[in-house]
């Protein structure tokens, strides 16, 4: 219907014959009246012709002045007159005020100014003024075209100026009208002429410096004005956006309102223009206006002060020289007076000598000689004073010449500086007004379209549609009531408007009308119009802007026929009365509710984050999440996340709604790193990722990033918000410097930095090596024999490898966080030309935060101060070589935490065992528990056994440690000699202790615990190709054959892993002490372990060779290949060994499974159960290297009670060594130790221990399917 009426309105609008198409701007509305009335006025036509004739004459006068006299003054006068006439014509006839005409006039002014009149003569006059003549013709042609279009009625909107020419705007007079005097004409002097004119002035330097200072103050005022204006505009745009959003939501709820779609479009235009203005303001504050101008101003101030200081020094030198000249002149005058006195005294003495008698001649001669000597001395002093005066005069002349040269240089430097500053000011000013003009142009076009649309509306149109829709609803209501009475009995309990529920289903005509109406609206929220007006017809709260909270829960909106079901709202944390509770619990109607529904708080200013919440009233005192104050009155609560805050805090709220209950406040800054890292899947704290990503998005080019401090109050607010909202904080509202301060504060307040305290010394030593390499590089650059020296790339590669090894010793979360931070800092360094932050600056900033020693109460020494430079140097090195040090992949996060509170150690992902990398493969391990305990009986039996042996050293513990040792060897071999760090060893030791103490079930534990023994894992992958040839051949043989051949090999492996022979075979293996070994010191063992790591190197694929020391100690090897005869291997000094069971014994045990267990338990012994001992599958006897044969020895069981064994023989297992179960154990050759290290104490007597019911089945299965433990 609206579209139909628009067509009718357009038909009624008939333009008159001479009338132009109208626009909403002021100038074009003026054109309408002029075109319709003024053009037909004869007086106006006569006046227009006179003005055009006058303008034509001025053009001719200017051309004649150029061709005839060619005097600069005359030409400028003619040009001044021409521009005055043109300006008067454009002011009098607004139709001729065109952008093209103004551009042509400016072009003419520029061409005239560009002519150098000193070079003009009769020969080159035409060449020099060719462009001037062309500009004159262009101006005349443009003026003629605009005049023709005006008279013909074809004036376009594009050619007209949007704003009329005013006295305050930039007129032609301000551009071109200048004085006739050439000495005062702006821009007519060359740089040399400017310097020469200033040199003639005695105070030229002071004047130039004064101008530079005034320029700085002027620029400061301009920048201050722009900044304050932009801040006010930014605040205004935010308020406009909030107001527009609230108004748009409110007017969208009312239907059939006049010009609703028009005002919705206007609100959308306000929001869009506000967003564009915010982007423009951000650009102007960054690199379009403020920052370049401030940078130029600071540079001007710096150079001005330097020049002023230099000029003052030169003047002081000149003053000293002039003072010396004055003193020399006074000295000359003084010496001359003394000489005159001595000369007169000599003259009087000669006269006395001539007039005296002969008796006094002798005395007079003596006096005469004395005065003559005094006269000569005075004469000599006069000559010396004259020489000094001449020297001072010469010095004064030289100094004066130097002062003039310095003066000339200073003036030249100041002139260049002023020109550069003017150029910058010009560029940023063009940016400022150009961006504002684009903003205003888009706003003008939007207003134009809105004005045209408003003219098309017919009054009363929406009211007519409302009446028509109401009549249709009434008819449908009557039909619906009749149908209900005929089909079903009346239902009580509904309000008077219950029957209007059926109005939702309208006839086709109503649907078409609704679609036609919605097609012309810009934004209509909620369901169809009838539903909103159904409530509005029976309640005045809608018309006054109130909410629908006064309706009860049993209203029409929750009737069975309503497809918009209302769900009960989440109850508030406060206590309220029954009526208020109903008001608060009722959600808004579908037309009201939405993602940005404000409800009763629509008049409250809200931030972007606050608009994401759905607030309701709060009636009980609670703590505000924004200011952390107590909310007593005027509190609000989100329905979804239950966030509580004051109404006044909604304007500054930065926590976004997560649509689920918000977690409580966490302790983030100053908290343990592991507490925050374990909550993240990759171990990287969320505050690090949020701050780094925000900085990379908008501040990589910001000058002084991470060096300039932010606002302290805003920084504290952001820290508080991160502790309250965590990932849901909107940090885009904060400045980049504030975000940088938060990141630095988090790193600085960590109790232990990313690089752990125990690795501090190693990293400091690495930094010292880096310093030595840098010094060598500098020396090689200075040395002329640099080409003969080898390149330093080898040293750098060595340092890179060492740094990689040290970083691998960090836990996974520390490594990943450090990796993430260093890569982020590398991106900052990549933009160092813009942000002025290179890797050295960032190293100085982040060095003490990432690497610091353990805090002590000792006083600060010089060596501790020297570590600051090493810390900065190390971080600089990590940033510079980040791509080589970090491979780009993060380490997997630990799935369990060690018993001591630390995170389990991590290894490189490429060398992780398969059981560590895929959790799915660990499921078969957990399922194996059913093989051991399938009934409550077994579990109870095991519990009682564990309790009875809790106070006695168990042989089972030794077996478990030995199993873990075998896994450690296999892990080291598979990883090609990669040594695990001390933290990993200590963490694994603590896990072993806790498992020995607290474990009730001696069965398999989780996949990360070291005391669990993996058994009967299905082989899901082929064996690695790095196996020896005989092992590969073994895989191709039958299971029975493998069983027969692998028995001895495994026994030899077990013997090599036995602590009895550790002195021979595992000299360089890491050691640890379990809690049962009382006589050992942890620190001593750790030092011994470090020495052993330094002395020996693990080789991956070396075959095990048992030295001749075995036979010297009485080790007897008896190997039988038959399956019916057991393999017996004995050792005289170790009598308590477990023989390998034969096939007959296996069959006997199988038959015994069917028998029920005896009611009386046999006496317990220290003999370990079979399911916990080392399994002995068949293995080839051949070695993997050459044709050497490996002696096969049994596994010698050593109980944990041997506390007097040397510390080198106490072994420690490594977490993640379960990969030994997936492949064969490759023994590693070890050098022989000393004889005293090989001496072992005797093993105490062990006794048998009863087996569980289900263990026999596992042993039988074990004999059939060989697996490696």
From Swiss-Prot:
- Residue ranges annotated for the Rho-GAP domain, each copy included: 671-886
- Tell me yes or no: is Nuclease among this UniProt entry's keywords: no
Q: Which residues carry this modification: Phosphoserine?
A: 171, 176, 179, 190, 499, 519, 552, 918, 954, 1026, 1152, 1154
Q: In its UniProt record, which GO terms are filed under biological process?
A: negative regulation of small GTPase mediated signal transduction; signal transduction
Q: What would be one Pfam family of this protein?
A: RHG29_45_N
Q: Name one GO cellular component term.
A: cytoplasm
Interaction with PTPN13/PTPL1: where is this region?
Answer: 1266-1269
Asked if Endoplasmic reticulum is a keyword of the record, the answer is: no
**Classification via InterPro entries:** AH/BAR_dom_sf, C1-like_sf, F_BAR, GMIP/FCHO2-like_FCH, PE/DAG-bd, RHG29_45_N, Rho_GTPase_activation_prot, RhoGAP
Ranges in coiled-coil conformation: 296-418
- Sorted alphabetically, which keywords does the UniProt record give? Coiled coil, GTPase activation, Metal-binding, Phosphoprotein, Zinc, Zinc-finger
GO molecular-function terms, A-Z: GTPase activator activity; zinc ion binding
- Limits of the F-BAR domain: 192-462
| Chain intervals with Basic and acidic residues compositional bias | 919-928, 1229-1241
Composition-biased stretches, type Acidic residues, lie in 1259-1269
- Biased composition regions of type Low complexity, renumbered to the chain: 540-559
User: Zn fingers (Phorbol-ester/DAG-type): where?
Assistant: 612-657
Biased composition of type Polar residues is found at 1128-1145, 1162-1172
Give the site residues for Arginine finger.
707
For region Disordered, the annotated ranges are 472-523, 540-599, 909-936, 1120-1269
Description of how the protein assembles with itself and partners: Interacts with PTPN13/PTPL1. Interacts with RAP2A via its coiled coil domain. Interacts with RASIP1.
What function does this protein fulfil?
GTPase activator for the Rho-type GTPases by converting them to an inactive GDP-bound state. Has strong activity toward RHOA, and weaker activity toward RAC1 and CDC42. May act as a specific effector of RAP2A to regulate Rho. In concert with RASIP1, suppresses RhoA signaling and dampens ROCK and MYH9 activities in endothelial cells and plays an essential role in blood vessel tubulogenesis.
Supply the name of the protein. Rho GTPase-activating protein 29
Taxonomic source organism: Bos taurus
Q: What are the top taxonomic ranks of the organism? A: Eukaryota, Metazoa, Chordata, Craniata, Vertebrata
Chain's gene name: ARHGAP29
